[in-house]
Amino acid sequence: RVNVSNYRTTEESMKWALKVCEYRENDCFVIDTSRNGNGPHGNDWCNPPGRSLGLPPTCNTGNDKCDAFLWVKIPGESDGKGNGGPRAGRFWGKMGSELVNNSN
């Protein structure tokens, strides 16, 4: 699993995972796209503002090594108390709404 609970772009995650696969024969991977639509927000990892949903879940990734794009992290699940969020793992409606509203 690549990019779980993170905001790295799908392109960046794919490049990293393919590099790892060079050293691990026959390995495949999935990428968490649940909230990477706008990529990371600088070094802010705890409920960063302005993020959006990424690609919807699919097995059509365009790469034989990548089995699927999945929403592993529940959109709206808090990273922790940073930026006004509740404790980690709690659903935060404000963030969930922002992810949806900022999506293409």
Summary of predicted features, one role per range:
Residues 1-94:
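Surface-exposed substrate-engagement region within the catalytic domains
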Residues 90-104:
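A recurrent domain-boundary module in secreted/ectodomain proteins
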